[in-house]
Amino acid sequence: YAPSALVLTVGKGVSAATVTPERAVTLTCAPGPSGTHPAADSACADLAAVGGDLDALTRSEGVMCPMIYDPVLLTVDGVWQGERVSYERVFSNECEMNAHGSSVLAF
């Protein structure tokens, strides 16, 4: 099997160079779901459904978030099915981040 192991972090701000991570979790999906992610089973299933493409994780319908700009930066680093992953995305606030990615970003 090709390894799939990721470290996800979130912190307030817009640049990985200046953001201090406030939370971090590990997520291992191969050979089986594990790690410190609170929903490893469903997060791995959600990632597998989009082939590990974090940009393909869609926003949950019906979630209402305040229109307040308080940016948070998500970083994801590691390997997915043996391929190196280094990903950053800024969300306008934490509610917007939680509304994306179903269980993957819920940590």
Curated annotation (Swiss-Prot):
**Any one GO molecular-function label of the UniProt entry:** serine-type endopeptidase inhibitor activity
- Identify the Pfam families for this entry: SSI
Mind telling me which residues the site (Reactive bond) is annotated on?
A: 67-68
Q: Where in the cell is it found?
A: Secreted
Which cysteine pairs make disulfide bonds?
29-44, 65-95
Q: Which GO terms describe its cellular component?
A: extracellular region
Q: Which UniProt keywords apply?
A: Disulfide bond, Protease inhibitor, Secreted, Serine protease inhibitor
Role played: Strong inhibitory activity toward subtilisin.
Give the multimer and partner information. Answer: Homodimer.
Q: Name the family.
A: Belongs to the protease inhibitor I16 (SSI) family.
- The protein here is known as Alkaline protease inhibitor 2C'
Originating species: Streptomyces griseoincarnatus
